[in-house]
């Protein structure tokens, strides 16, 4: 919500730390889809099953927008991704973001599962967050204009993305073709970020 003002503040390099706690949807207002909701996911506005016209819906039909990479293209003082599964990494990046915001715009994107909207037991929260990273569905990296982009946690032998997807009810309806699409996007996104890291080095 409110990307126009976020982009404007970043372009002006305002001395702001902007943190997004990303649960991949509008979870506090009824679990609606957002542009950061993953492809295939169930939400209250991307339902699963037959609709009134007899057409079968299988979740969100678009891929998620990669907001952190959009912020890198604003050439912010600092941009990073983090996960609630790796708190030391998150705290380290928060410290860096606070320092960077003293001289310009800093952006921190924290992936945080929502047990209700993602449909899994509360006691599995950390496990779901960890599997997102260990499958490369979520990548942990940081960027600044001087040092470029680099990974803070490399996953050299990732688990298949199915290990992440099957942990949540929001993906229960996926077809084999949809799962294949998601796995191919994970590989594609990883290659793209690696290319950016190489270019920025």
Predicted regions and their residues:
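Thiamine diphosphate
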Residues: 1-32, 85-92, 96-97
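Active-site lining segments that contact anionic ligands and/or coordinate catalytic metals
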Residues: 102-107, 146
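Flexible, low-complexity linker and terminal segments
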Residues: 112-201
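Conserved thiamine diphosphate
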Residues: 35-100
């Amino acid at each position: 919500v409110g990307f126009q003002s976020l982009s404007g503040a970043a372009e002006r390099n305002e001395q702001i730390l902007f943190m997004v706690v990303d649960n991949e949807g509008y979870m506090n207002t009824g679990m609606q889809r957002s542009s950061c909701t993953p492809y295939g996911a169930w939400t209250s506005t991307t339902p699963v099953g037959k609709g009134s016209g007899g057409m079968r819906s299988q979740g969100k039909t678009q891929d998620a927008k990669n907001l952190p990479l959009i912020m890198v293209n604003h050439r912010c003082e600092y941009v990073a991704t983090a996960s609630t599964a790796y708190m030391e990494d998150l705290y380290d990046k928060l410290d860096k973001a606070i320092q960077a915001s003293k001289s310009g715009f800093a952006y921190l994107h924290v992936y945080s599962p929502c047990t209700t909207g993602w449909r899994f037991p509360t006691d599995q929260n950390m496990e779901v967050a960890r599997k997102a990273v260990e499958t490369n569905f979520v990548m942990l990296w940081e960027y600044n204009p001087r040092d470029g982009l680099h990974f803070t946690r490399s996953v050299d032998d990732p688990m298949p993305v199915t290990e992440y997807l099957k942990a949540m009810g929001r993906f229960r309806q996926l077809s084999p073709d949809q799962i294949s699409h998601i796995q191919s996007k994970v590989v594609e996104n990883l290659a793209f970020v690696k290319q950016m890291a190489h270019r920025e080095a």
